């Protein structure tokens, strides 16, 4: 079986590399034609795709997947409509490929500039969410990259159904069907091969829990753009407008629990904790959110709060649980975020411009937010159309990774017979 998995992955890799050589020079109109054909194929096959998703959901329930995982797995008609809208948005995006920037003459008479080009072949490993299959595929096609998708075994039927529509659209447009491939085995050995096939794959994008990210980081022989967990914070500073702070902190936690940009720890300045905490605790109680707090939080709110442990400050709950800490001010809040956070998305609520600027400068996260919910940390909300992930790395791409994050630049030199003296 091991040999057959290796042979299968080698074939997938070779097909992706061959497809990437065609895609890299595909015109914008051809790529958009393919994406439009994919849109039509998805529309025509909505019932079949949702039925495939229900098979995954039934398996998930029988395997006792937790509610957060099931929420991410489910494709409702509304979410399917959102997927289609995301695809429309990608079609409307400006194609970055071939763009030449920084063109300038040198004293020798040559012109030097930079041209934006595809990365080549992207390998993506992700869990649960079948909508990621379409988002990643559409961004890869638009940016001229081939992509190999390894979704979670819990979403295999959904991913295969979506991939069929994608293949149909590529075929209609005359682009290689293997530009987008879903690995159709749940064997974990496939991941091991994917992250070490340097001859075929140019970059790996893992989206998932710490164990997945650690495995990929430790074993990959290919550059990695990590999408780590989202241990996000909101700090309600002493000069916050509480009419803003209440809806922001409620939305950041309860809008959707099982997403990486949901707040997991609430930090409150000690100067307003006595006033603010009882109000927000009442709103959380209505949503049945369990609070785990520091001793000062417990003193203010009483026995409705469970004691927080050191582990709670590090935890991405992905559910109706929230850690709460009262801090002495902005310095302690920033220190806490930089120590316990995952460098994903963190927010401050304040009317003090100087402190807001300080927070923006000192918090070491891919997205830093002032007076808004952490839930805005998303490629669609940032105007990227869709995202392949939210990078918590600092090299190449950081934050939501859209079209430009799937490209690099090469130097171009334009001459008229010049030789080096």
From Swiss-Prot:
InterPro entries: Ald_DH/histidinol_DH, Ald_DH_C, Ald_DH_N, Aldehyde_DH_dom, G-glutamylP_reductase_CS, Glu-5-SA_DH, GPR_dom. It comes from the Bacteria. SUPFAM superfamilies: ALDH-like. Pathway: Amino-acid biosynthesis; L-proline biosynthesis; L-glutamate 5-semialdehyde from L-glutamate: step 2/2. The keyword Cytoplasm applies. Keywords: Amino-acid biosynthesis, Cytoplasm, NADP, Oxidoreductase, Proline biosynthesis. Its EC number is 1.2.1.41. One of its GO terms (cellular component) is cytoplasm. Pfam families: Aldedh. It is an enzyme of class 1 (oxidoreductase). GO terms for biological process: L-proline biosynthetic process. It is found in: Cytoplasm. Its main location: cytoplasm. GO terms for molecular function: glutamate-5-semialdehyde dehydrogenase activity; NADP binding. It catalyses: L-glutamate 5-semialdehyde + phosphate + NADP(+) = L-glutamyl 5-phosphate + NADPH + H(+). Catalyzes the NADPH-dependent reduction of L-glutamate 5-phosphate into L-glutamate 5-semialdehyde and phosphate. The product spontaneously undergoes cyclization to form 1-pyrroline-5-carboxylate. Belongs to the gamma-glutamyl phosphate reductase family. This is Gamma-glutamyl phosphate reductase. It comes from Acinetobacter baumannii (strain SDF). The lineage of its organism: Bacteria, Pseudomonadati, Pseudomonadota, Gammaproteobacteria, Moraxellales. The gene is proA.
